[in-house]
Amino acid sequence: QNENIKLISNEHICHELINTYQDDGIILEPAGVLSICALDKIPQEHLKNKNIVCILSGGNNDVSRYPEIMEKSLLYLNKKHYYIIEFPQKPKQLKKFIFNVLGENDDITRFEYIKKTNKSFGNVLVGLETSSSEIIENKMSDNNFKFKKILESDLIYSYLV
């Protein structure tokens, strides 16, 4: 691989689409932000005291896709995470999860009861927006919630994102 060629993830592109829209009010197409994304891949010391030109292109973007773009941006920023969580089949478990696991600024963005696996437990697909998945995971463990984080390499990930 040529060191001058930069690989840009879909999530990074989505992040920059959101940034240019929110910060500058510019609606670009995904290909239009590639030059901005590439700048993030170049060490800052190589850019110092140089004139840099980025070509931005197109408003050829369907605004109805912005919720999907926003989600991919949050994934890129490591602020959105998906889990399969085993909830005990007894009263007040969701309340326990909300009060003991979630922080003040954490948010449940998806909650799907998958199925009761037995009389004692049921699996739930949970999407969380959080600034620290590590803290969430530690709190889930501390509160005896069994869970599996859904990773990009998991087959179900492409279904969710």
What do the PLM-derived regions correspond to, one by one?
Residues Q1-V161:
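PLP-dependent amino-acid enzyme catalytic core
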